[in-house]
């Protein structure tokens, strides 16, 4: 349990009375409806949507009615799900699956079981002796809206086994279960945390700041409030109501219970849930935000990459600030309670936290010392939730009983917790114009994030924080201020003083001038005043008028864009490729359409991957074949665990092994998949032995791109890199050129990823923005007069970073990152030719 730090500053020197005037309520207003969408050939309906013109605020009326309207229509295009599947099997729904899954005893067609409907007994080839999936496995396939914290409809078909027979054993249930083909890993491991996490926040403003979610887009970085509870809407509404009358502080009590852990497969190997696949098929191939926004409403913004099944306990207790102050609770900062002595749920120490105990009893406002809060519970029986909404300060045993009863119910009624997410657009595949629709869904997600940007809100008074909740804006107030606009109360200590500036929303894009368009925003929502800080960021932004990715897709899938002539002639399905398949195959192949082949995991494509539908209605296919390039893990000895866990490993990929259950590894811990498709060194040389006394073990010295974990060096993650020199690099597998840093390239090489340096002009490197002191890179130093970072001289380098090979004036030489960065900073043209010293490349 964390050590509790209570920043409840009541005994401050000087209070500043807030003389703000009350803000008039602002009623929500709808904008006009957008035009009707194209008529859907499958549902014979069209939709239109209206956005919010004015968000309700300060207690004003909400918008009434639905944002969407739907009407019947006569389509001018057919339904894509009625087309054939070429060499693949067509389910009744129109979804296509591999013919190898037909008559295998499993219902791989999600909703209709068409693949098993007409199979004779003699044709059936059962692929496994059991078909019982792990309990609650269907939860791992749900979509998730990261802004609302709510799970949405199913996007992954968790019922399909993919023709595989992978089993997992539950020690608790003493039974074997069969894993879905979409699950990479599933582990039954019960984890019960007996240490509760207690946190105090001196205002809802502090709490919202702490729990905000930061979203990074192509244009800017934005922060939005997101409750981790599925009841986030009721939480924020209640918070707004409760702060109209007085100031509250928050005590947050949290804990989790885990019963299983899962990792889903990579997106290209996931089978989509049939309803989700249908919705993707119905999406228009021309960008229409209304249609794509409707998909986000139904299925969320992300899908689950991994997570745990279990329960999450989280209760917010509101404590009256004035009552805490009246009880002279002003020295908690100096008398922090120790984590071993302060437990509301399990026990209550009689010493060390007496001031806190007395203050909370007084602030509870009840005779029986019951502190009531708002529970946000995920998982477990619904009948236990009411018992978790309060704490009896004099009866910790009773608190424990109620919590334990709920925790036991989690085993049978778990929910997904501790989830890691991947954007939903990564699942756009196996439908016509999939690449175009994937790009459009990314655009729609950007617009969706814009709807939750606080720039739509009017300023809160006294430095309050505005957040968007549906069609309303809410104000979260700083300590000792309250009201619908935070207009009442007092600002305390260093909270008092000036008002920080806030950004307005971006303007519309300007007309194109010389191939570029611009937009702007102002720091006037509110403007800085009284010595407050100005906004951080740029006031203008420019970009190319034509999206480069969209232009590329026009060449790759011209039939997905308006043409002067509508294609009337089509090629048959592309020819099959052994050990490979067509990416985003679709169902229609008009003249001029290109398709791209790729190989199954563990194979690499040799030759030209692009085939084209010719005017003679025949496919123009070059020489190509799939060559095996992967290693497979052997059966490991008991107790040995491998990371990462994958069905196949390509040449150059690295696997690390470790021991569980108090054992230590004897032998090598890292193995490389060699060009002969064998592991080097041999994995049979690794085994687990009884762990020695950790006091006698030497601490290994890790490389700069490694970190110490469990007494051994493991690869860092790219985001763990500090400031490092920017370079352009190409992913040798996808051939995509990305902006990276020297440190990130070392980390990716450590993880077995193959990246090579390219010229600086081959990608767009981050602009060298002017930085304040405290954020200077290796090659920068602080200028005391301007309080800004300026370029170092190469001779002034202190922390040098990595040694790299740099070409300067046509000659290669080894220098540190700091020295190279100093030259680039001063405008000299340099080229990084290797992320290692020059001599290391020639050896």
UniProtKB/Swiss-Prot annotation:
Disease linkage: Complement component 7 deficiency: A rare defect of the complement classical pathway associated with susceptibility to severe recurrent infections, predominantly by Neisseria gonorrhoeae or Neisseria meningitidis.
Gene Ontology CC annotation, any one: extracellular space
Protein name from the UniProt record: Complement component C7
Region Disordered, residue ranges: 108-143, 219-240, 516-538
Keyword Repeat on entry: yes
InterPro entries (UniProt xref): C7_FIM2_N, C7_KAZAL, FacI_MAC, Kazal_3, LDL_receptor-like_sf, LDLR_class-A_CS, LDrepeatLR_classA_rpt, MAC_perforin
Provenance organism: Homo sapiens (Human)
Activity regulation info: Membrane attack complex (MAC) assembly is inhibited by CD59, thereby protecting self-cells from damage during complement activation. MAC assembly is also inhibited by clusterin (CLU) chaperones that inhibit polymerization of C9.
Sites carrying sugar chains: 36, 202, 503, 506, 509, 696, 754
Region of interest (CCP 1), residue spans: 545-615
